[in-house]
């Protein structure tokens, strides 16, 4: 299962905080798949077959700080453990254009990840695909920064890193689980 973290509502679609959903939309498009609204999972879903692996995709359609409900509902329904889920999210510690795959426990201060960890109530490692968005100079500006659109240059760099990850099939590194 792959989850692209985001906030709902049209006003947030182009924000830095929604790059997780940017990745999933691009991934689904590369496999000619469309998302459908699944109310029972509080999100948009589709599925792919990658290297003979059937993979479910989820973009929660609820706010970032409560998206654990959506992830937990779908994971429980399909009997998927947190350790078998790849969470795709924005990362303040990486510059735009940089993305990294990580397998670890924790949320590093990311509210979406925090809610997922708290909802599953488990201290276990899980896969994260971190997409760099950069960081504002002032710590007090983090909320407004992640909820704002990237500059044109940053958006190009972010989109290139997403397309590069899809073309290089970074998922093949974790499909063994």
Swiss-Prot record:
A GO BP annotation: rescue of stalled ribosome
The molecular function terms of the Gene Ontology recorded here are: peptidyl-tRNA hydrolase activity; tRNA binding
| Glycoprotein in keyword set | no
Keywords of this protein's UniProt record, alphabetized? Cytoplasm, Hydrolase, RNA-binding, tRNA-binding
Reading the lineage from the top rank, the first entry is: Bacteria
> Which Enzyme Commission number(s) are listed?
3.1.1.29
Chief place of localization? cytoplasm
Task: Kindly state one GO CC term assigned in the UniProt record.
Answer: cytoplasm
**Binding annotation for tRNA:** 12, 63, 65, 111
Q: Where is the catalytic site?
A: 17 (proton acceptor)
The catalysed reaction is: an N-acyl-L-alpha-aminoacyl-tRNA + H2O = an N-acyl-L-amino acid + a tRNA + H(+)
Per the UniProt record, the site (Discriminates between blocked and unblocked aminoacyl-tRNA) maps to: 7
Where in the chain is the site Stabilizes the basic form of H active site to accept a proton?
Answer: 90
One Pfam family of this chain: Pept_tRNA_hydro
Q: Where in the cell is it found?
A: Cytoplasm
NCBIfam families assigned to the protein according to its UniProt record, in alphabetical order: pth
What is known about what this protein does? Hydrolyzes ribosome-free peptidyl-tRNAs (with 1 or more amino acids incorporated), which drop off the ribosome during protein synthesis, or as a result of ribosome stalling. Catalyzes the release of premature peptidyl moieties from peptidyl-tRNA molecules trapped in stalled 50S ribosomal subunits, and thus maintains levels of free tRNAs and 50S ribosomes.
Q: How does it assemble?
A: Monomer.
Q: Give the UniProt family note.
A: Belongs to the PTH family.
| Name of the molecule in the record | Peptidyl-tRNA hydrolase
Organism listed in the record = Buchnera aphidicola subsp. Acyrthosiphon pisum (strain APS)
Q: What is the lineage of its organism?
A: Bacteria, Pseudomonadati, Pseudomonadota, Gammaproteobacteria, Enterobacterales
């Amino acid at each position: 299962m792959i989850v692209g973290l985001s906030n709902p509502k049209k006003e947030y679609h182009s924000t830095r905080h929604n790059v997780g959903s940017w990745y999933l939309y691009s991934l689904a498009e590369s496999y000619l798949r469309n998302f459908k609204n699944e109310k029972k999972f509080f999100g948009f879903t589709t599925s792919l077959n990658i290297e003979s692996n059937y993979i479910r995709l989820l973009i929660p359609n609820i706010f970032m700080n409560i998206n654990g409900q959506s992830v937990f509902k779908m994971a429980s329904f399909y009997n998927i453990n947190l350790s078998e889920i790849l969470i795709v999210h924005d990362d303040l510690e990486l510059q735009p254009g940089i993305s990294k795959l990580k397998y670890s426990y924790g949320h590093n201060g990311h509210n979406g990840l925090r809610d997922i960890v708290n909802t599953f109530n488990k201290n276990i490692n899980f896969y994260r695909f971190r997409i760099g968005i950069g960081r504002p100079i002032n710590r007090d500006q983090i909320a407004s920064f992640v909820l704002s659109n990237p500059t044109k240059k940053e958006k190009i760099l972010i989109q290139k890193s997403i397309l590069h990850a899809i073309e290089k099939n970074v998922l093949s590194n974790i499909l063994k689980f």
